[in-house]
Amino acid sequence: MAKHLFTSESVSEGHPDKIADQISDAVLDAILEQDPKARVACETYVKTGMVLVGGEITTSAWVDIEEITRNTVREIGYVHSDMGFDANSCAVLSAIGKQSPDINQGVDRADPLEQGAGDQGLMFGYATNETDVLMPAPITYAHRLVQRQAEVRKNGTLPWLRPDAKSQVTFQYDDGKIVGIDAVVLSTQHSEEIDQKSLQEAVMEEIIKPILPAEWLTSATTFFINPTGRFVIGGPMGDCGLTGRKIIVDTYGGMARHGGGAFSGKDPSKVDRSAAYAARYVAKNIVAAGLADRCEIQVSYAIGVAEPTSIMVETFGTEKVPSEQLTLLVREFFDLRPYGLIQMLDLLHPIYKETAAYGHFGREHFPWEKTDKAQLLRDAAGLK
């Protein structure tokens, strides 16, 4: 493989689309806490001074949509009208109905293991050994930059920062291996009083340098810090936000394929979400077992049918055992039926709001990040 560049981006928790994702998942968590069998498809729209929460929810639980919304916006940091969005005064509108009975009859079963998929679709999972969390480096470090932005904003290190921010990192590869970072973009919302020179110096010293490994930065690395020169108007005042519009940020930063389905606001019966988590779990365990350096899993479903319609394993020529054997191992050690994967990953808990910013993958405390099957796979493959 020749030398090449690869770029991924991330956005902060204060980005309008991420506000929407977090509200949708906060509603989901509140419902699952009371009713683990609830059916939830919650969508959120945010714009200056307003939040609209809609979707289809079937549950025995009662939750206060307005309170959940305000608390979520408050935690993100939009608490003053001079930011163009204020948790205390924004309008909160609700337009929620029930899940179609036509879908229910295809999902619910007397035998839970025969629970059908909530929709047709295809999902991908991916892992690579180029980082400690078995994720692609570009998206991993893009996430870490905006996480650091939120950290120094909230702890008062840089009090003039505001919640909306974006990052982008371009890595240099040579024969598939990282050799450096070519370019870094970081744009952060800020208050009026900070001048651009001071902002750029502070962002470099407090955000970029503590996060990006020095050995990957060279005199040729280009830094773009607030390249428009001003970013005071941001958040929902700058752009409207919608649930499910950051699906590449949520996954692998473009390094792997994507089936098209968003995650946030969906309960685990929706395979768009749960099967994508399971596919990551499978791919990560294959790489952790040393059966491949890179692994991409595709799984697909028909609505109302329990068994996947297909399972594909792609290892990009890095496999240590034949690909056909890998597929057999996946079928043997992982139950990818909707109920099976819910049980395998213990998904019927309020764990989703935290996934809604800084990526659904690569953070070790999520259950789909476990590598508990790596040794089983290695032994079954006959590797010493």
Curated annotation (Swiss-Prot):
Main subcellular location of this protein, as a coarse class: cytoplasm
Name of protein: S-adenosylmethionine synthase
Alphabetical list of Gene3D superfamilies matching this protein: 3.30.300.10
The EC number(s) this enzyme carries: 2.5.1.6
Record: residues binding L-methionine: 56, 99, 239, 270
Family under the similarity heading: Belongs to the AdoMet synthase family.
Reaction catalyzed: L-methionine + ATP + H2O = S-adenosyl-L-methionine + phosphate + diphosphate
Organism, scientific name: Shigella boydii serotype 18 (strain CDC 3083-94 / BS512)
GO MF annotation: an example: methionine adenosyltransferase activity
PANTHER family tied to this protein: S-ADENOSYLMETHIONINE SYNTHETASE
Binding site for K(+): 43
